């Protein structure tokens, strides 16, 4: 008997392993047929039906859209054309790839509805499903009222001085501490921007949300970051985490969720009480949000998830924007030199207010560098899904009411004929382009009235830290970086793994 089991068990295991691809294929075919029946795409007689991807078990194209989105977007566009439909889990998403299509669809975006749980399933909903950025209609207006003043352009301008100070402090302390130096190359440092610079925007936003942070609060927030990052990777991987039955299986995603939520709620409540005691101005956003929850205006989940969205959900987003800005300048010496001259000229004024206003302006070469990086390296390959309340025709194709639509950011920002030599880094292009045309031909904060709430603060953070780096260092790609555009493994936003060399400006002059 024992001998028989010794033979039988390995054979059964091998059979299951061999049968898995067949089982996945069968599931894919059956579910694809069901979804096409459930979500038909009508078309006029004599016109071509909209191209549709085949559903593949278990996430459709949902996981590929995040982890392999940039290459997938090009392949899908070449295969299916300028408008096509994919599956995010069991949810259909229509992809628009031209600015003309996007303008047509987003013309009435104030009436659009954000996709439930971002079309990413149950676990996503538990993490960010009711944050302000994913609410719609009256719920969106109700929660947005609690935070919009704190992120407005006038309020953002009040933070510029703090952001400049934090940038200088961060470079002086954190950059040097996390760099590689030697006695022979004193002052010359080697860093990986995506790892070294990530906590500057993170701590800057945390200070706006919670007020001046104590050393203990800083430690708590930065310690929570890896846990939150692992949790979101489980969200993107999908599978069982897409289903509301996931808690029954005690998956890794569920365990991480429970651990994070417990610590996050405790931190937010403690931070609220600490902020009330400090009574600082401007008033930290946590006070208004927590008091709105206590008054019953918003729920505790809406409060906690909106704070999470502003801080942790944007950690990889801001890190992506900052690190690619630095790397593109490291690759383009002429632009770097021009920017350094502009920054030094702005610093010549004795009044600190004038330098802060320089950071605020959107007509500088610094602002153009930030824009060009955002154009060339979109943070996400596709926008978040949303739907219109009525049927719409785009380029002859019918988009049925309440069908979610996403935008191929790479197609609009780079491959779009509007951008002459679109694959090349050229910040000066923005000085000769009409601002209205740029808005319609570049996907960054979204189209229409529902744009990213934090864009004004985000712009100032990027400009403050990039200006400070270029003022202090001549940067270049490190010789030991294997690939210039190598990416971190498992990064859902395409964080670069490239290292740079930073030579103090004075030392560079001496060498020359």
From Swiss-Prot:
It holds the Pfam family p450. InterPro entries: Cyt_P450, Cyt_P450_CS, Cyt_P450_E_grp-I, Cyt_P450_sf. Pathway: Mycotoxin biosynthesis. Its cofactor is heme. Heme binds at residue 452. Glycans are attached at residues 118, 421, 434. Cytochrome P450 monooxygenase; part of the gene cluster that mediates the biosynthesis of gliotoxin, a member of the epipolythiodioxopiperazine (ETP) class of toxins characterized by a disulfide bridged cyclic dipeptide. The first step in gliotoxin biosynthesis is the condensation of serine and phenylalanine to form the cyclo-L-phenylalanyl-L-serine diketopiperazine (DKP) by the NRPS gliP. This is Cytochrome P450 monooxygenase gliC. It comes from Aspergillus fumigatus (strain ATCC MYA-4609 / CBS 101355 / FGSC A1100 / Af293).
